[in-house]
């Protein structure tokens, strides 16, 4: 399996297009033509993680957090430059799966909920998928070759189906004028043509490509076409809602997940004895969604990186919070390893996958 094949597999299961626009995901360092010798999953790509990959003989690291994020202005032999230089020197490919893994139904938040032993887990804050229904009108004799070209270029696909078109027949009218150069008809004469309306669906990212291909392969000098926007609730969403088996107090639940996640500290906001049943989770840094979580029925909102003023606001408004620290996302190392092994087994791919043993939490606790 080459890196390009791995990227295709990852994009199929955890689409990079679902990442936030500000994010930097995908193949950050590497060569698509290189064969994969092994995959190491990591929360962060630190120098220690790179050394671990080298020791194992693995040439691919998949990290959750992008190493190249804010922009690199130099590649000196220190700091981030040292890490990047070592990756390149040892021909190690680096792939980032950040917010696309956050919003995935099997991603980080699902992994956290399962690690906490919760049940009835479902995605919240679902994204809106934007599609377009494309319709254009073409002379009957040109329909076949036109559809062939669109299909060859990846349009009119629905899941595992290609060449997904709908046709309806009718008559078109037009009159070429001025400097027109008509394929059919004569200048200043109204022309009636047996035409077919062709309809097909595309993803939002294919819109400009579809317009280009229609203009390129349509026989008319000035083809008529429409893009009709359609929005649907996506399977992807930032966060999950889940439940404990039996009601617990806020303090007991905080202590329970501290133990299950094996993290050194947990903070919480709210009355210690308040009963907890439904839990909303956004791993990493999810502040800003706590009030939506309450509106959706959560008794407590679990996330990391909670600042003082956000915590105070929540306390004043009676919103329960639990801060499990950003590093709690480390569960994705084993979680992504399991996903990769399952996908590889389905495709009959024999490549070693391991979760990094390196603790990349920058904090020390006393």
UniProtKB/Swiss-Prot annotation:
Zn(2+) 1 binds at residues 64, 102, 329. GO terms for cellular component: cytoplasm. Coiled coil: none annotated. Transmembrane segments: none annotated. Zn(2+) 2 binds at residues 65, 326, 329. InterPro entries: DUF34/NIF3, DUF34/NIF3_bac, DUF34/NIF3_sf, N-reg_PII/ATP_PRibTrfase_C. The keyword Zinc applies. Keywords: Metal-binding, Zinc. Toroid-shaped homohexamer that has a central cavity of about 38 Angstroms diameter. PANTHER family: GTP CYCLOHYDROLASE 1 TYPE 2 HOMOLOG (PTHR13799:SF14), NGG1 INTERACTING FACTOR 3 (PTHR13799). Belongs to the GTP cyclohydrolase I type 2/NIF3 family. NCBIfam families: YbgI_SA1388. This is GTP cyclohydrolase 1 type 2 homolog.
